[in-house]
């Protein structure tokens, strides 16, 4: 036998054995756990009516999955510094078997972007292996822009929302990163940042504040009339940050300045991504304080108003946790309804701009007792967790067209509710929520966002005055009371 014939025989034998092994795996684990391949993933787009996501061949796609990090990697999780390809592959096998089709994962400054203008090989090598595993299992990946989880270089420890040099560095990051992965279908969309928030007060905002007021009013007399207070020449030229008990119009103006900063931050990064990958989808992972239905303080409003952000983004994302009456402990039916009404009111406002909406973080604890807050919260069952998460999806369905649970696994190292929010226990066994998630995944993928106006017509709810909510400390609580009343009546 010649060398060429020997190689051909070996190749055929290898193909036969590979096929036999794959068949055995399919029979033993079920088709859902069988890996896909890169060619099975189609590029995701927003449909022409901006109601939902579709594949490039026109099929509806509903991102239904998890935020990915592993237990045993510390807190905050060291996703890339403790990257284990074997463990990641097992995680993807498990996710595929339970209906996950999309994972959101944090990129970090220390692993990917220690110096402005240069991507780190350390992070890129792990990222490319992560993408390859995702392609192998036919699961989309939703990367979130550089975060603090694995440490911050000195240049990124300053304000990276308003500081011009920091924003320029982020623009360059996206030029490099999005350009490198242009056209890679496995990447569902880019999330610019996890829960960005414009600072309440710093030197850059102080520099911009006089210019904002001068552009808006033109004269101190006009400003005095609007604020209904006397404005001195000094106050006109060097205005102070308004106190929270100050004139409502003054507070609103300052909040609008913060929104202007947020708009510029988003616009510049979106433009950077689109310049190197015009078909890439881009969003921002909004904290729930971006919709001021409930704010611990007017200063905690993020400045990222959904109706303003929507003009720059392909779709909108929001995160939600049940905090309507403090830390939700499953104690009463009234608490449950208050939190469901709160969730609906937040997602409703995010849907208002007419873009698809993904609830990119949600979930709550179950399957034990939390150790946080001196252990004061009562234990919760896995069934309570599963019921809450399923209800959250049900109440936002029709407004949202995607949901990503916070955590694949419980994470005992966490210093917050993440300790018990996973689909799976630390040992990899499925919780009640994993089984419910799997059940929902079989039907949720046909879901599609309704137009906001259509939903409004079918769900009579009180109008939300966004401007008052970010400038009047008493407005939001009254709104929530009225909203809950209407929500309860509809139930």
What are these regions (language model features)?
Residues 369-491:
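Aromatic-rich peripheral "rim/lid" segments of glycoside hydrolase catalytic domains that contact
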Residues 18-28:
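Bacterial N-terminal signal peptides
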Residues 2-17:
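Bacterial N-terminal signal peptides that target proteins for export
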Residues 245-253, 288-289, 319-334, 346-386, ...:
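Active-site clefts of carbohydrate-active enzymes
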Residues 41-313, 369-372, 380, 396-405, ...:
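Active-site mouth of glycoside hydrolases
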Residues 33-67, 470-491:
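Mature N-terminal, pre-catalytic/accessory segment of carbohydrate-active enzymes
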Residues 266, 339-344, 383-390:
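Well-ordered, non-membrane alpha-helical segments in soluble/globular domains
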């Amino acid at each position: 036998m010649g060398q060429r014939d020997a190689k051909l025989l070996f190749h055929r034998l290898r193909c036969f054995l590979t096929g036999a092994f794959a068949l055995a795996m399919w029979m033993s684990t079920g088709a859902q756990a069988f890996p896909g391949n890169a060619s099975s993933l189609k590029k995701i787009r927003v449909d022409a009516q901006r109601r939902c996501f579709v594949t490039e061949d026109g099929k509806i796609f509903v991102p239904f999955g998890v935020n990915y990090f592993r237990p045993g990697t510390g807190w905050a999780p060291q996703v890339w510094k403790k990257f284990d390809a074997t463990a990641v592959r097992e995680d993807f096998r498990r996710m595929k078997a339970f209906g996950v089709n999309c994972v959101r994962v944090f990129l970090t400054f220390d692993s990917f972007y220690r110096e402005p203008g240069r991507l780190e090989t350390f992070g890129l090598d792990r990222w490319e292996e992560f993408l390859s595993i995702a392609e192998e299992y036919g699961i989309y990946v939703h990367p979130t822009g550089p975060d603090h989880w694995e440490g911050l270089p000195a240049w990124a420890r300053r304000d990276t929302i308003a500081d011009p040099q920091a924003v320029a560095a982020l623009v360059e990051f996206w030029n490099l990163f999005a350009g490198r992965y242009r056209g890679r279908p496995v990447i569902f969309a880019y999330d610019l940042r996890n829960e960005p928030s414009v600072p309440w007060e710093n030197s850059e905002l102080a520099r911009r504040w006089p210019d904002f007021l001068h552009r808006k009013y033109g004269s101190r007399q006009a400003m005095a009339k609007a604020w209904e207070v006397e404005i001195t020449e000094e106050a006109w030229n060097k205005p102070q940050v308004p106190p929270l008990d100050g004139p409502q119009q003054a507070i609103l103006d300052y909040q609008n300045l913060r929104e202007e900063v947020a708009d510029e931050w988003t616009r510049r990064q979106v433009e950077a991504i689109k310049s190197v990958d015009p078909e890439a989808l881009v969003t921002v992972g909004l904290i729930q304080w971006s919709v001021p239905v409930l704010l611990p303080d007017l200063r905690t409003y993020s400045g990222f108003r959904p109706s303003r952000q929507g003009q720059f983004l392909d779709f909108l994302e929001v995160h939600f946790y049940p905090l309507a009456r403090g830390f939700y402990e499953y104690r009463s039916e009234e608490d449950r309804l208050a939190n469901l009404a709160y969730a609906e009111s937040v997602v409703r406002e995010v849907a208002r701009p007419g873009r698809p909406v993904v609830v990119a973080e949600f979930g709550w604890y179950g399957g034990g007792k939390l150790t946080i807050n001196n252990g004061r919260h009562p234990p919760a069952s896995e069934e309570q967790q599963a019921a809450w998460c399923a209800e959250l999806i049900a109440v936002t369905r029709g407004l949202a067209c995607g949901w990503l649970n916070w955590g694949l696994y419980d994470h005992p190292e966490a210093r917050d509710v993440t300790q018990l929010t996973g689909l799976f226990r630390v040992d990899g066994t499925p919780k009640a929520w994993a089984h419910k998630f799997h059940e929902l995944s079989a039907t949720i993928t046909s879901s599609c966002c309704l137009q906001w106006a259509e939903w409004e017509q079918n769900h009579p709810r009180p109008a939300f005055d966004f401007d008052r909510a970010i400038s009047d400390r008493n407005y939001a609580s009254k709104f929530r009371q009225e909203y809950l009343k209407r929500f309860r009546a509809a139930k």
